[in-house]
Amino acid sequence: MPEAARGSGKDTVDSDTGSGVDCAFPSTTKTDVCSSNVFVNNFGSVRQGDVVTSHPMTGCGSESPKLSTYSPNVFVNGMGMGRLGDDYEGDGSNVITSGSSNVFVN
């Protein structure tokens, strides 16, 4: 089972495209928005529709993609829970690459 994703900048997201045409790649950003009342290792759980931090590279757009792949049967606040390997774009371009070492989600 994949590791649970944690918000508030705890876990990394690799971006092979960035969010603007002038972005250098590959680049790494962090998880951002998350649940305010369901926690994994004292960090909010990442959920369906939560956004990643803005791309950190100079010249990139400020678009913040939403989590679009997630657990099909574990829910946080009524939304699918994010996991290691889930994607913020749905096309494999903004993938969660770290997660909890002791909480796993189907």
Which residues make up each language-model segment?
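Intrinsically disordered, low-complexity proline/glycine-rich segments
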Residues: M1-N106
